[in-house]
Amino acid sequence: MTVEYTASDLATYQNEVNEQIAKNKAHLESLTHPGSKVTFPIDQDISATPQNPNLKVFFFDIDNCLYKSSTRIHDLMQQSILRFFQTHLKLSPEDAHVLNNSYYKEYGLAIRGLVMFHKVNALEYNRLVDDSLPLQDILKPDIPLRNMLLRLRQSGKIDKLWLFTNAYKNHAIRCLRLLGIADLFDGLTYCDYSRTDTLVCKPHVKAFEKAMKESGLARYENAYFIDDSGKNIETGIKLGMKTCIHLVENEVNEILGQTPEGAIVISDILELPHVVSDLF
């Protein structure tokens, strides 16, 4: 069902978003706690990254993985996404919900469907949706997480800790800085919303190939991978990653997919030292 939104409605929407983004930026710039500054290069030149056959890489998803799904950030994100669907596609709340779920289930990310079928500007979508989330009201420095990642880095068993997310880089970096772990990773593979001609995301194999090239990984059997999506974990297993860990905090999300055979299941990322004890 088509719903008409007035120019006043859209102006109110834009103003609310702009005000929240300004607050988000001001807060981010004020951070001084350990791990609040990014120390790895972003958008590094792939051609300058040699593929090392002996390199061991641990790939980390971010959302609902480095922080708990019980923070309800996903719910906030869904509200923001649905508002975008309603205002920009002129849909009823019910139709927006159905279409969003359809794209998320089919492509792993709503924006991919929006770009493919509605010619949506992906960067504007990111600004109105992810950039406008008041993450600072929810995410705080996570000392236990930081200490665990430090142990993993210092063990000498893994060469690189690498972020692998379907979010755009803005959202990824905000999460890391707020959690106080932005200085513990070696790089970031994200869904590049500026490249709508080649927009790829997990669970697509091409997204994994991108992460492989950017990290310098030469062989999937030298890769460790943790994600809250069963579909993403399934791709990792099919590609031959050494260890794939499905993080299921409470129960499996049907849209994200069931736990595939061969995956390790944990309910909290702090369980990593118990399930891959040889790395710590």
Swiss-Prot record:
Gene3D superfamilies from the UniProt entry: 1.10.150.450, HAD superfamily/HAD-like
GO molecular function per UniProt: nucleotidase activity
Alphabetized InterPro entries for the sequence: HAD-like_sf (IPR036412), HAD-SF_hydro_IA (IPR006439), HAD_sf (IPR023214), Pyr-5-nucltdase (IPR010237), SSM1_domain (IPR052791)
UniProt xrefs under Pfam families: Hydrolase
Domain of life: Eukaryota
One GO process term, biological-process aspect: pyrimidine nucleobase metabolic process
Similarity comment: family membership: Belongs to the SSM1 family.
The protein's role, per its UniProt record: Could be an enzyme that inactivates 6-azauracil by modifying it.
Protein name: Suppressor of disruption of TFIIS
Classification lineage: Eukaryota, Fungi, Dikarya, Ascomycota, Saccharomycotina
Underlying gene: SDT1
